[in-house]
């Protein structure tokens, strides 16, 4: 079977890759509305999760196409992304800890 890169330029794949996170963002916001229920949506929470999974899957497909649909390239890229994400998660937790520790001190 032909690869995506056989039909679309790298630039076109990148354009698609820019669109898909925007769609994932919309799905995430819809899920937030479903969970929060202050601004109701007709979509159920499970359907909202399904939409978010689908859009993230589209992002993953774009990454795969950009990396020439090579499993090793994809795994390497995702591993590098994970390495970059790990310290960011740690910093995020530290910021939250600092903020809520400050709020606890203010309450005393």
Language-model-detected regions and their locations in the chain:
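Flexible "arm" and connector segments at domain edges
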Residues: 1-108
């Amino acid at each position: 079977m032909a690869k995506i890169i056989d039909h679309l330029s790298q630039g076109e794949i990148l354009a698609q890759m820019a669109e898909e996170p925007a769609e994932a963002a919309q799905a995430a916001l819809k899920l937030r509305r479903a969970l929060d229920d202050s601004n109701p949506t007709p979509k159920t929470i499970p359907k909202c999760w399904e939409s978010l999974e689908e859009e993230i899957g589209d992002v993953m497909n774009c990454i795969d196409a950009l990396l020439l649909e090579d499993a090793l390239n994809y795994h390497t890229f995702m591993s590098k992304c994970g390495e970059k994400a790990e310290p960011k998660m740690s910093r995020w937790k530290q910021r939250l800890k600092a903020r809520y520790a400050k709020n606890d001190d203010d309450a005393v």
